[in-house]
Amino acid sequence: MENKTPEKSNGNNAEFLRIENITKSWDAVTAVDRVSLTIAKGELFALLGSSGCGKSTLLRMLAGFETPTSGKIFLDGKDITDVPPYERPINMMFQSYALFPHMSVWENIAFGLKRDGMPKDQIESRVENMLQLVQLKPYAKRKPHQLSGGQQQRVALARCMAKRPQLVLLDEPLGALDKKLREQTQLEVVNILEQVGLTCVMVTHDQQEAMTMSSRIAVMSEGKFLQIGSPSEIYETPNCRFVADFIGDCNMFNGSLIVDEPDHVVAETPECKHYVGHGITGTLGMDVSVAVRPEKIVVTKTKPESEFNSCQGEVVDLAYLGSYTTYHLKLKSGMKLKASAPNIDRHHEGAPTWGDKVFASWSESAMVVLTS
């Protein structure tokens, strides 16, 4: 998974949404556990985690559908913790889209504006503007069942934005779409939100979706934030084993620290010695994990010269995936190692194949040492 470069801006960096020590508990179950967060105006922020991690509960508290057990929520400097949903300048778009099947696209977008008593001429102008923004003007008279999944998603987004809320909440916004359409729609949604300049918080369990769409990500587990950062920070420098393993594919070598210098460390695992080109906060002999992404590993039939950062194994499986090939190696220690290589040439003569004895190696900057 690769994020677009350069990375998306964090809005204008002015604090807009602030969450202070929010907790939500039901009897003995704590769904959200003392989380704090600030989000800038115009930022697209993702809450990422597996089912049951607390991300949707947090989103519902932002919307006002759930009341925090403790903590505060501030929007544009105002305490909205106890403000009911219908009085919050916030709109939420659900995974199901919740479009009215008996209404046309135009009528769906206009619905909230009519409920608010907006003058007819202003409604017409606003709806036309939204239709143009989401590129659905030719479909204004169609009913939802006459649209594709991606078009329905854009109608729901237009309806969500039509009232010009201060904050937009997206709950698994693209979960109902197939993979190819989902990937295409991700960038469309980002472009629309950026054009309008809205601040957005989205919930997803899809790592690629979070990394493609958001400027920053909070990885959640058991009601807590484990790491908050840009997509590249989360992917390249995870701060714990869970984040490294949850975001993308990762090979985890478990061992102990045998050299601890300010500019480098050496960790020893059953597979090999790892020379890591940066220091860590730790002590000799402590248990560590060395994380290496598959795409940072080079697979060759010849043994590397260095005594560090390489190990021997056998190709037990491989998967040709078009743009790259993934090798599954069984190392002497019994560990299964995953390595990915780009398919630069159409036919790569001499490339490793099933049953080959090979060497896997990686650079000193390809690793992250994890202590928790």
What do these predicted ranges mean?
Residues 4, 250, 259-372:
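Non-catalytic connector elements of ABC transporters
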Residues 26-30:
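Short coil-to-beta microelement around the adenine-binding A-loop and adjacent beta1/P-loop entry
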Residues 44, 85-245:
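ABC ATPase nucleotide-binding domains
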Residues 63:
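Helix-to-loop junction immediately C-terminal to a conserved catalytic motif
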Residues 71-79:
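Conserved ABC transporter NBD signature motif
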